[in-house]
Amino acid sequence: QTLTYDDIVGTGLANKCPTLDDTARGAYPIDSSQTYRIARLCLQPTTFLVKEEPKNKRQEAEFVPTKLVTRETTSLDQIQGELKVNSDGSLTFVEEDGIDFQPVTVQMAGGERIPLLFTVKNLVASTQPNVTSITTSTDFKGEFNVPSYRTANFLDPKGRGLASGYDSAIALPQAKEEELARANVKRFSLTKGQISLNVAKVDGRTGEIAGTFESEQLSDDDMGAHEPHEVKIQGVFYASIEPA
């Protein structure tokens, strides 16, 4: 069914990934002599968990649920890249282009708000070896880059920035005052994240696949001013496999 702009605007539908019927339990054959691409990869997060330090020192830190406070613009979409067949029969997806990042803010139970850049930039994800077809038992696992939430020209409330602004907003800070130095000296950090894509539905005729994903990455660190939080993101995904 074709929807118009008026049908979609203000409903949140634009943030949802396409889905496949529950009966889509087929297989998409892979020919090692051919090359393939993954197109229209869409990642729709449904749960954001943040690792919280326990109040009791005898307990271990654990991921706790949060509340999303960002508007309906959290999904990654139109991601594409090469799907390579390796010598051991495994498949490797290399992300090349697409809407591969979204700034997101979540709120913890105590009221603290955690900004993060939900992303899969430069994702390289591989399957298990000896894959002759993509089925509901196929899993992709890999790493991606997590850029800084802020860019070089961002100025904080005191006018400090990486490429512009004041060098310091403190009159005469102590030489060994590390906390003040971290706030003054801005840094563009690039960290790593991990993701697993678990295929649950396959349309062997069209090459469409769908399933669930779980991603782990770090939150924003305010350009080095404080320690980032560990964030776990869970959701659903959709993609299309096609010959290159």
UniProtKB/Swiss-Prot annotation:
The record's section on SUPFAM superfamilies has: OMPA-like (SSF56925)
Record membrane topology: Peripheral membrane protein
Keyword line: Manganese, Membrane, Photosynthesis, Photosystem II, Thylakoid
Could you give the cofactor binding note from the entry?
PSII binds multiple chlorophylls, carotenoids and specific lipids.
- Cellular compartments annotated: Cellular thylakoid membrane
Record's GO cellular component terms: photosystem II oxygen evolving complex; plasma membrane-derived thylakoid membrane
Q: Which domain of life is it from?
A: Bacteria
Primary place of residence?
membrane
Keyword Nucleotide-binding found: no
Single GO biological process annotation from the record = photosystem II stabilization
State any single GO MF term: oxygen evolving activity
Subunit structure, as described in the record: PSII is composed of 1 copy each of membrane proteins PsbA, PsbB, PsbC, PsbD, PsbE, PsbF, PsbH, PsbI, PsbJ, PsbK, PsbL, PsbM, PsbT, PsbX, PsbY, PsbZ, Psb30/Ycf12, peripheral proteins PsbO, CyanoQ (PsbQ), PsbU, PsbV and a large number of cofactors. It forms dimeric complexes.
Family recorded in the similarity comment: Belongs to the PsbO family.
Under which name does UniProt file this protein? Photosystem II extrinsic protein O
Annotated source species: Thermostichus vulcanus (Synechococcus vulcanus)
